[in-house]
């Protein structure tokens, strides 16, 4: 069985999609699964043992480019795929498998993709509340499985592979001290400060952890570098040597390895949060206006802190510097209590194993 998956274009969604690959591979161990996704996804896909090959999608996120998609599809015919799974909901994402003449093309209806998909699923959001459940459902017969509660349990959550040698080599390359365990902070989030725990709370937490013998690694893209600098500048001067701002300094590949090296991770609702969960790191996930009811961190070692309910489509908070009040109200003391509980549980698990 040869399978082509048209993968998502967001870090968090790409991570959650691994649950589908794991489910397909568990059902058919000899299945060959290729994933077509933006080239930046390769560092994630290469660490998913279920994926045979990461195929770069050369077209931009919003580009239709019908002729190029036809060319791509026809070029894939020689690979002889038996099935395709289309994870994005867009019309254009279903074109390549259609032009590749793949016999069975599975996906949710999305943008009215009748004809393009011939194993079409109509989404009942109440029956399939979690994104990961919607992905996994595609592996099963739509007549037999009509709601998430019918899926075999437990779901196979995302699980990335990183070697111990990679962790040590990469940590040394970025100047992390071997004698202090690392706590990772992911202080960024898409769409502005409303989804971010305030930098001054991160700084207060960092100070507590540094005083307790840890070092801090700040992760994120180049646009998160300023937030990292704000955290650093708020620390006591003698503590700054134990906090490393890696935002914008690491490629995604290196960030994955470094997150795997962390003793634990504190994160806003972001793609890096989902990566940390897939690396099985003790994780405290901080939510405000966005909701964990749809895309929670998929890990037994994750704890979510959220002080409000429901989903609030807010890109800029009402408080100073654009933060959301519900995130301001999460105190560093609450976070460190949750973190210490997680670290204690993780230590007990390590002793038992």
What are these regions (language model features)?
Residues 1-353:
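Catalytic machinery of carbohydrate-active enzymes
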């Amino acid at each position: 069985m040869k399978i082509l998956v048209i993968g998502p274009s967001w870090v968090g969604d790409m991570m959650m999609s691994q649950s589908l690959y794991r489910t397909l591979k568990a059902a058919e161990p000899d299945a060959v699964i290729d994933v077509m996704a933006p080239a930046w996804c390769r560092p994630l896909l290469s660490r998913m043992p279920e994926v045979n090959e990461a195929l770069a999608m050369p077209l931009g996120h919003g580009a239709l480019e019908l002729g190029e998609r036809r060319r791509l599809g026809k070029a894939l015919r020689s690979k002889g795929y038996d099935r395709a799974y289309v994870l994005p909901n867009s019309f254009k994402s279903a074109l390549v498998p259609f032009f590749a003449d793949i016999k069975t093309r599975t996906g949710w209806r999305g943008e009215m993709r009748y004809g393009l998909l011939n194993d079409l699923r109509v989404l009942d959001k109440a029956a399939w509340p979690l994104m990961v459940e919607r992905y996994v459902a595609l592996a099963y017969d739509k007549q037999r499985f009509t709601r998430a509660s019918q899926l075999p349990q437990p779901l196979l959550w995302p699980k990335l592979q990183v070697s111990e040698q990679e962790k040590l080599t990469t940590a040394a390359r970025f100047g992390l001290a071997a004698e202090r365990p690392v706590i990772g902070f992911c202080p960024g989030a898409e769409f502005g400060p409303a989804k971010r725990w305030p930098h001054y709370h991160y700084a207060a937490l960092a100070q507590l952890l540094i005083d307790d013998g840890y070092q801090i690694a700040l992760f994120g893209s180049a646009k998160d570098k300023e937030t990292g600098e704000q955290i650093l500048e708020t620390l006591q001067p003698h503590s700054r040597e134990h906090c490393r701002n890696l935002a914008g300094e690491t490629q995604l590949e290196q960030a994955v390895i470094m997150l795997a090296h962390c003793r634990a991770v504190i994160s806003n609702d972001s793609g890096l949060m989902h990566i940390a969960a897939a690396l099985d790191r003790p994780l405290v996930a901080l939510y405000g206006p966005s909701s964990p009811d749809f895309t929670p961190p998929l890990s037994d070692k994750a704890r979510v802190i959220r002080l409000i309910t429901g989903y609030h489509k807010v890109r800029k908070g009402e408080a100073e510097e654009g933060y959301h009040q519900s995130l301001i109200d999460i105190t560093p003391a609450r976070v460190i209590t949750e973190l210490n509980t997680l670290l204690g549980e993780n230590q007990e698990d390590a002793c038992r194993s």
